[in-house]
């Protein structure tokens, strides 16, 4: 079955083989590449990620989305063209043993964070601090018994660099792929001042969360569970022990797939 | 003499009385209030901040600016209308005992940061970690002997909240003045998740800088010198000892005033 993670800036795809119960990460498509360049319809981009052989075998897909409505409209119509019906999963108050910490308005918790919580609860039989470093850096506390204790949302690296460009007259146009170095040091020019500043803010937020975890997990052991494209880089700078799960969200979607046909 | 700090989002004014050598903070004018509302010319706003009695006594002003060119044009023409000639100060490689850490391109260091370095060197006879929490959060390392070791630039609180609004579909429109609480806690709704996330990133960056200061100051004592509107709030969350200087930048401008007539 096709698993879809429609994120803020790109959509990621994976294939769950129900026979082997294995999840294979297929690839990601940046939203800008199809929203700006209509010469290459999304349907063709999808066929570069998902093989037609897989699509013939299974016409159902399951996904979650925090993407903008324009992205969703195009994604749904392109998948329908390929004969695929998508079951979009919503955040709930309780599911698969996890209790949502947003007690007043559970549906307001991002569905990407919800799926990662479900996936983590199934994979990590331990208190977990989930660090998802993508377009935004999200941090969530999840107890071993499935209680979600809430979390944080911080602008990711590129959003931070953009924010300085917009808010000031002289600090424009730095992009993430210009950054190579791990570790923290004082910046001796504007480029390093800004890129190291973003690194300090992102790693600083994670360090604050790790410190707070003692209180939240009553000084019991916990795992730092890292996912998202920028996660590994940040943890190397922090030199903190962590376990990496690239498919945490997809593991959550796979759990939801069980209920599709039940 | 009128002292002017033309910042990213507002201009701040102070009066230096050369006889008493005292600096009186006069007030600030947000740039949007004159750029958007031409019905109230900047000249009138200035006269609400600076008394005509002061303007008659002294027709020279000294300032530094990181503001956009539209702001500077309006500011200069309005001050000229009031008969005031402004000596805008630029960042240098060396001045008043301070050596700029941007060795390759010293002029690229923000003049607001340069003035704060000059003011700090004169006021604080100690190694200093300067934390200026304004539109951007800037952090600078300054040795007791006047050597500047470089620094960081991080989006300030409102820029971080805006960044999430721009980079994601569902996290829009949170403003700084909605925030009351000190201290850090997991967010149990989207508002708290974002505002606490910004708090964690800003305090986390400062905490990372404090940690790095041991290395930069070779484990010698140092002061955490805090300035900028958001500084006190952040330091209360960090519960770290610090000394507050509201007029650090103006103290730097006052040092430059000595050379105006020499």
From Swiss-Prot, chains A, B:
Pathway per the UniProt entry: Cofactor biosynthesis; coenzyme A biosynthesis; CoA from (R)-pantothenate: step 1/5
Active site: 112 (proton acceptor)
Binding positions for ATP per the UniProt entry: 5-12, 135
Disulfide bonds: none
Positions annotated to bind K(+): 132
Keywords: ATP-binding, Coenzyme A biosynthesis, Cytoplasm, Kinase, Metal-binding, Nucleotide-binding, Potassium, Transferase
GO biological process: coenzyme A biosynthetic process
Tree of life domain: Bacteria
Enzyme class of the recorded protein, top EC level: transferase
InterPro entries named among the record's database cross-references: ATPase_NBD (IPR043129), Type_III_PanK (IPR004619)
CC cofactor: NH4(+); K(+)
GO MF term (any one): pantothenate kinase activity
CDD domains named among the record's database cross-references: ASKHA_NBD_PanK-III
Alphabetized Gene3D superfamilies for the sequence: 3.30.420.40
EC number: 2.7.1.33
Chief subcellular location: cytoplasm
PANTHER family: TYPE III PANTOTHENATE KINASE
Family: Belongs to the type III pantothenate kinase family.
Protein purpose: Catalyzes the phosphorylation of pantothenate (Pan), the first step in CoA biosynthesis.
NCBIfam families, alphabetized: baf
Subunit structure: Homodimer.
Name by which UniProt lists this protein: Type III pantothenate kinase
Lineage of origin: Bacteria, Pseudomonadati, Pseudomonadota, Gammaproteobacteria, Alteromonadales
Name of the gene: coaX
